[in-house]
Amino acid sequence: DLDVVIANNIDKLFTYKPGEWLTIRDFLRSQRPTWDRYNSSVIRFDSGQLDNMWQEFNNNQRDIQKRFRGDQDYIWDWAKKNKPATLFPDEWIRSWKWEVRSSKEWAPGGRPGNRTFKTIETVRPDKNCCITVFHGDPNPENCKDPFVVDNWR
């Protein structure tokens, strides 16, 4: 995904559980600990490993786009029926908005797609976190937190 900021070395994402396809638990996990849906911001798979998923999507695009709200819902549904993903450890990939920052308040006047936070925070992800994800608002380019400004390129 393009709305992520690399926080620390990402090598372990490529060496963890070789041969398995991996993704992350959706960030509602921070509000519902048993939430088992996927977030598609970070996925790792070997070439050809998910060809069946792609072929099903390619052959049924219109129907799939009508049935599912987005790619994450389709991927989760496909995986349930075919080959569930192995999950990266939650602490390796964090939601900037829900798991790194403390304040979630929006600045006044912003519209969805162009909002930013009301306050600037000097937080940074812990040493185990490789990637921070910006799902929904704000996008990294709209976030004024120093860590994001310094690392978003």
Cite the ranges covered by each PLM segment.
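A conserved catalytic-core signature of glycosyltransferases
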Residues: D1, Y38-S40, G70
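GT-A fold catalytic core of metal-dependent nucleotide-sugar glycosyltransferases
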Residues: D1-W35, R44-F45
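A short secondary-structure junction signal
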Residues: N8-D11, P33, Y38-S40, M53-N58, ...
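Sequence-level detector for tyrosine residue identity
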Residues: Y16, F27, W35-Y38, W54, ...
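Short, surface-exposed beta-edge/turn micro-motifs
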Residues: G19, N39-S40, N128-C129
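Catalytic core and acceptor-binding pocket of nucleotide-sugar-dependent glycosyltransferases
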Residues: S47-R153
